[in-house]
């Protein structure tokens, strides 16, 4: 998420110079109170009912690979071809390894990764280095696709699946003014992003 936030911070700091910002990056869900965190950004379905959440938008997910990987291993022409390729996936939860391809039983194709990582950003770097085929959000990979560093695959079979992006904070905590203006700012800026979708 830092690659999304970083370009926005100069404008936010110019508008609100009195607000001090401390950023943290974590691959796992954190306790916001224990970590003294006002707001967190989360992608995907929320599990914690103790959270207030503001939906900032949605982002599509796609199957991607680097040109170098495809040059060496070939380009899959169908979902069935993926069985012959090195797939990159998440350690947990397993739902993140359900790719937006039909499984023939009315659901999504669940893959068995050859390489697993806990972080989408780690998987992105593995894919960029030619280590295999990955499924990630447009939020994370839009610039890679635009530059040609990652190539979309199986677009003709891809289900139009997207993930929600939320700003979350604890339900029992009074929303601080600084948090409110930051969330409002994020909502305005995210809506301008090229990967943004208002609805799933």
Positions of the model-derived regions?
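Beta->alpha turn/N-cap motifs
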Residues: 27, 43-46, 65-67, 136-139
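Flexible hinge/capping segments at coil-to-helix
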Residues: 50-88
């Amino acid at each position: 998420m830092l690659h999304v936030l970083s370009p926005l911070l100069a404008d936010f700091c110019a508008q609100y110079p009195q607000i001090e910002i401390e950023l943290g990056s974590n691959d796992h869900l954190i306790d916001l109170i224990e970590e003294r965190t006002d707001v967190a950004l989360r992608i995907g379905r929320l599990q914690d009912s103790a959270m207030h959440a503001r939906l900032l938008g949605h982002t599509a997910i796609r199957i991607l690979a680097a040109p170098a990987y495809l040059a060496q291993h070939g380009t899959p022409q169908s979902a069935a071809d993926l069985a012959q390729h090195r797939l990159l996936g998440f350690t947990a939860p397993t739902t993140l390894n359900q790719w937006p391809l039909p499984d023939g039983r009315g659901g999504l194709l669940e893959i068995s990764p050859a390489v697993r990582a806990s972080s989408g950003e780690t998987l992105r770097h593995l894919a960029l280095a030619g280590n295999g085929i990955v499924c990630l959000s447009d939020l994370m990979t839009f610039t890679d696709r635009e530059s040609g560093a990652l190539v979309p695959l199986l677009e003709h079979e891809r289900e139009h699946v997207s993930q929600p992006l939320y700003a979350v904070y604890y339900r029992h905590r009074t929303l601080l003014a600084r948090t409110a203006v930051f969330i409002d700012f994020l909502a305005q800026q995210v809506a301008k992003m090229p990967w943004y979708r208002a609805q799933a």
